[in-house]
Amino acid sequence: MNQNSIRIKIKLAHNPYEVVIKKNGLARIGEELKKIGFKKATKVLVVTNKDVSVHYGKEFIHNLSDNGFNPTLIEIKAGEERKNLATISDIHNAAYTSRLERGSLMIALGGGVIGDMTGFAAATWLRGVSFVQVPTTLLAMVDASVGGKTGVNHPKGKNLIGAFHQPKLVLIDPITLKTLPEREFKAGMAEVIKYGVISDKKLFRKLEDAPRLDKLETLTDRFLLEIIQRSVQTKAHIVELDEREGGIRAVLNYGHTFGHAIEALCGYGTWLHGEAVSMGMIAIGQLALERNIWNISDLERQRKVLCQAGLPTIWPRVCAEDVIEILKSDKKVKDGEINFIVPTEIGKVEIIKNFTVNEIKQALQKLASK
């Protein structure tokens, strides 16, 4: 494995692109844009937040300018509680002020929330302009930046407003993880663990064998590159099979159905997305155990790895009836039935939709009593 640069092709019929994992990649953004056909003088709107901008904004803009692009940077307030149409309007206002045209470009420089909102703003500005993902969090690197899902939250649920809009490029620079708060790093590890549970036994065993997963400094560069690469490859393969989530792509939502309910009920921003997904994985694991689909040994293996990553595994104090009401408005509801992504063994899940309200209540009540 080339430790300095890894390229993973996302082979879609109409919108193929590459995920480039490159050490010090931020300093090569201009060159990477030229490689995929963007010309000098192209107007570029870089969307980021204050925390990321402090560390990388100035160098990033200078590199774009030095390569002949015409960049503007906008800082928005990030966080799930700001992931709404009001913030999209702020990005659109910046696009208008910058005179972005159909041939212009938006770049998301930040975490998953920045990527989701920038992608949606790009999808809806002038009926669609190009955008590029430059994720700076582990969660965004392995999950949110790949696959073309963009959108914002609605008061009644997470990501209910959105569009599929594939990026032209995803540029991952692992160096940015050095400035990532520890809590954010741990939250991102939830998505890595998810890939192990749904599809990649080898990745799961690798995570199990690590003494701890909650601190960046305890992981070697090689280990970090490998888990990012394996996660992206898993997602790439699934997205290639099902770009618009008509079938198999739904497995990527493992842990998310209950996780989204936790975020909505506890208030966006109370739990980080990865933390909510961790608790969601615990919940669906319990539901699978109650149905005798999953065994207690694998349930415990999942719990231990989540604990190694410093992630929450205790179900929060939320009313089971309220959870069920949120579940009914989930994007994965089809013909009035909730599609659950259910583990059957480590490395394998199934889509099951015939769980009764009683089964869900019993599983949640059992979790609440632990």
From Swiss-Prot:
GO terms for molecular function: 3-dehydroquinate synthase activity; metal ion binding; nucleotide binding. Zn(2+) binds at E191, H256, H273. It is found in: Cytoplasm. Its EC number is 4.2.3.4. It comes from the Bacteria. It catalyses: 7-phospho-2-dehydro-3-deoxy-D-arabino-heptonate = 3-dehydroquinate + phosphate. Its main location: cytoplasm. It holds the Pfam family DHQS_C. InterPro entries: Dehydroquinate_synthase (IPR050071), DHQ_synth_AroB (IPR016037), DHQ_synth_fam (IPR030963), DHQS/DOIS_N (IPR030960), DHQS_C (IPR056179). This is 3-dehydroquinate synthase. It comes from Prochlorococcus marinus (strain MIT 9211).
